[in-house]
Amino acid sequence: MIEKISEIGVDKVTFIYTQHSERRKIKLDRLEKISIASMKQSNSLKKLKIEEIISLQSFLRNYNTNDEKYIAHMNEGNELLKKSFKKNESFTILIGPEGDFSSNEITDAHKKKFKSISLGKNTLKTETASIIACYSIIQLMS
């Protein structure tokens, strides 16, 4: 995922762990190397900033920006990203783990003004959902 989102021009990624996450550690140095190689390959002038992994609760507690905010999850009735999209200079999108966000995590995100969205009718792996969400936002911005 790091390689692909770096190629398409994402500025920053923060890994979060949730109730259903399988991993609570990442190899930051390995991800940095992948990002740099991808940046060089794609002739990008900006380096992807990769943040340390933190809990969703910590992320939401410390989150205070004017970004357009979305949380992608599997609940029926969520609008597609392209229907919910509002142009802004920066975006934050939360992508859940393979087991999705818990209902409490979704509620906590809503309290921080994250809007629930869908990335489509198919169930996607986290890596695929991340790439699709980032690419979709970049395309909707242009």
Regions found by a protein language model. Give the residues of each.
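RNA substrate-binding interface of SAM-dependent RNA methyltransferases
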Residues: 1-68
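Short beta-strand segments
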Residues: 16, 72-73, 94-95
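Conserved beta-strand scaffold positions in the cores of enzyme catalytic domains, especially
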Residues: 50, 69-71, 114-118
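Short coil/turn segments at beta-strand junctions that form active-site/ligand-binding loops
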Residues: 65-71, 89-91
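Strongly charged, low-complexity linkers/loops
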Residues: 73-87
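A C-terminal functional module that forms or caps the active site or interfaces directly
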Residues: 90-107
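Structured adenosyl-cofactor binding patch, chiefly the S-adenosyl-L-methionine
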Residues: 103-142
